[in-house]
């Protein structure tokens, strides 16, 4: 399978002037900003435009910054509340993405001369900016489903 994410992404020099970043820093100090940047890095590294946040991701962030998992969850919830991540996708699907994340993904794809494909149920940018999704691959085991675990705020659930 081809790599979906990126090895690098651009960071705007005026990001510290963003009111959302200021609110995050005021509430959670440097820890909040560190968690946000870690998750943002994972979004671009793994899939390019979203992250299905799992218990493993929660552990990784917590372990990397040496903070409680509950605090990580609270910080991510606050990031969704203030609009750094899409609140609806976070609450309903445990997915971390946002309009600005997807716009940056599209920009990076253009520079890399790569088709920008965003799943319909996750797309927050206008449809004309993204390439049509390729048809799904046939199942190796027809009729069998293997549910993936994901985090839905407040509980674990099968996908």
Language-model regions, residue ranges each:
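Winged-helix/helix-turn-helix nucleic-acid-interaction surface
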Residues: 1-10, 58-59, 65-159
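Short recognition helix of helix-turn-helix/winged-helix DNA-binding domains
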Residues: 1-47
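Short, low-complexity, polar/charged sequence segments that are solvent-exposed and flexible
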Residues: 27-32, 54-58, 104-107
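Alpha-helix N-cap/helix-initiation sites
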Residues: 29-33, 50-51, 69-73
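Short acidic, hydrophobic short linear motifs in intrinsically disordered regions
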Residues: 47-63
């Amino acid at each position: 399978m081809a790599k979906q994410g990126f090895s690098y992404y651009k960071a705007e020099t005026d990001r510290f002037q963003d009111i959302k970043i200021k609110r995050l820093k005021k509430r959670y100090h440097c820890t909040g900003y560190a968690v946000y940047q870690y998750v943002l890095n994972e979004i671009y590294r793994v899939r390019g435009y979203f992250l299905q946040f799992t218990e493993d991701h929660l552990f990784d962030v917590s372990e990397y910054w040496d903070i409680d998992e509950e605090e990580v969850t609270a910080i991510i919830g606050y990031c969704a509340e203030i609009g750094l991540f899409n609140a609806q996708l976070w609450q309903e699907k445990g997915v971390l993405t946002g309009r600005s994340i997807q716009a940056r993904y599209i920009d990076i794809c253009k520079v890399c001369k790569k088709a920008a494909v965003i799943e319909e149920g996750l797309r927050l940018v206008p449809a004309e900016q993204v390439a049509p999704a390729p048809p799904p691959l046939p199942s190796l085991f027809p009729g069998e489903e293997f549910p993936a675990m994901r985090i839905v705020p407040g509980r674990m659930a099968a996908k």
